[in-house]
Amino acid sequence: MMLSRRRVPSSKRALLLFVLALSSACSTIETKRRDWSKYTGPGAQYFHAEEIPFPQVDDPLEPTNRALAGMDLALARYVIRPVAAVYRFVVPQDVREHLTKTADNLLYPGRVLNNLLQAKWSAAGEETARFCVNTTVGALGFFDPATDMGLHPRPEDFGQTFAKWGWKRSTYLFVPILGPSSIRDALGAIPDTYAEPATYYLPAALGRRFHLASNGVEAALRQVEVNYDAYEPARTLFTLNREVDVEDFSWARDESGVTQSLDAIFLEPEDRDFGARAHTDTVWIEATGRELSFSYWLQAEPAPLVFLVPGLGGHRLGASTLALAEIAFLNGSSVVAVSNPTNWEFIENGASLSLPGYVPSDAHDVHVALTRVNRRLVSLYPGRFTSKRLTGISLGALHTLFIAGNERLAETEGLVPFDVYVALDPAVSLEHGLLALDRFYNAPLAFAPQERARKIDEIFGKVLYLSQGELDPGMELPFTKLEAEFLIGLAYRLDLQFLILASQARHDLGVLRTRRTLLTQAPAFREVSEYSYMEYMHAFVLPYLSTRVPGITCDEAGARRTFERCDLRAVEGGLRANPRVLVFANENDFLLRAEDITWLRDVLGARAHFFPAGGHLGNLHRKTIHAVIDAVVESTDERAPDHARNGSVDPDAPTQPP
């Protein structure tokens, strides 16, 4: 977790010496792998296909780094967070955002100096122009008109200068409070600090550090809660940011459903403190014998209650979940969210099967959990909910439709009925969706082998360049179709790693060979990074289901039957008969084939709504889309029968799917 990247010399020296003294605590665990080269069982073609290697980072000090990251987490959670809450309450969000811009403007001397030392003349000129514009027109940096003029930040520091001069790779280092670093960057932080004007006025230096820590602590802690292991992606992203140095790349964009899908990054809450205002509670899940957490936002007066289920790997406090919760809350509804069955939290605490991926079971587990949540909220706040609406996004939308399709059977089990079922950008075929994600991840195979590494670095370079500035909804993201495919596939491949490790921590099938300890995880991540989604389904899920689900055998026929049962066509009858099912999707969503769209229109008729563009989730941040969805949902809710609105809940409902 990184709360601030600027350093104070004395504390940096002390912490650096401390960490170097602990450097003997190195990891000795090796990555081991199962040999699939001679495998001829179901799905063998996926195990023998060429794959792009997942970005890996050497971390010889991992045990020490993880221990220090744990100290940092405790400090942030129990010291910084309470103080920061007071600061954020007193200082409005708009003011804090402008203070951040002012603090950033003060970094100009170090930035321009390091651009010059690296012979980046154009970048130094652009940084100087930014500083002049923002200092004058922008009122000492309180505003950022330079970005609107096309002058983007060019942040460089002495660590990057040392890299440019030849010190390319350096041992990763985590320093409490100061965050991810390396030996090279730690040394570079000393001249960095002296190049920062605030250093020479202690109140300014302390104020800047306090502001940045207070402003970022909730987001940082949320990353720890949302991810199965926040340390791993933070280390990889930091190292890529420090090592990828691409000055020239093609600023090109293809207009396609895939590139439009990248606009899903804009699906985040407008109020950055919205997540911090969530109430969190737990319900008991019989299948696991554990408590499952849920988050909710309650209206002061009686209102509809919206149940949210996020997409693949999604957590109840993830950015897209919070965005949808905020939209529903601002529209007058109370909102409750649970994590997706493919997220570590649900795998550990809410799943009847240890391995997610079998949609009928996953959807049933969600329904059981929501039934428990509904009963809990109704008991705490009687008379506060005028109706109940289930909304799912992406894979959560597929689960929502399975719940809707099995509504009559669920009622016999005492599971909560809903007045409206809203599916946002669902897949119809799980198999098609997983194949698409695997294909996207391997999109760079289209590059010639000798230039593949450079091309991938260029893609990372674009991402890192854009991350330095303001990203506003509506701006064009400069990625080609192939580049967008790779970025989407890469993001979901990391979710797969979390999924595999979380499921194997609960029930080890013996597929993985690498030992894991509390402070050494990197070797295991290297092993699981070599599995695709289709390999996961055939190496983990299929053998597991064959011993637990009637009709599933561990062969090609069993694999085919599994995917058929995970297809929406398996619940076609229930969907046709349920007038309260709504689907909102885009015609150019990569998860939907032409025959899938035709099938949805045939089954749902006017209840299936398709927008002409937006890709997968790429237009859900747009208020015009919100208005269309809200109008249709309200109209459907008004026509809901009383049995759904006032349905009773059996607290002893079974927790296993039929």
Q: Over which residues does each language-model region extend?
A:
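Short beta-strand/loop motif that positions the catalytic acidic residue
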Residues: 583-585
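Short, surface-exposed "cap/lid" segments of acyl-processing enzymes
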Residues: 297-344
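Alpha/beta-hydrolase active-site loop
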Residues: 355-380
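N-terminal cap/lid segment of alpha/beta-hydrolase-fold proteins
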Residues: 253-301
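Conserved alpha/beta-hydrolase "acid-adjacent" motif
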Residues: 590-596
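Alpha/beta-hydrolase-fold enzymes
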Residues: 405-527
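N-terminal targeting leaders of membrane proteins
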Residues: 26-121, 207-252, 643-658
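Catalytic histidine-centered segment of alpha/beta-hydrolase-like enzymes
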Residues: 614-625
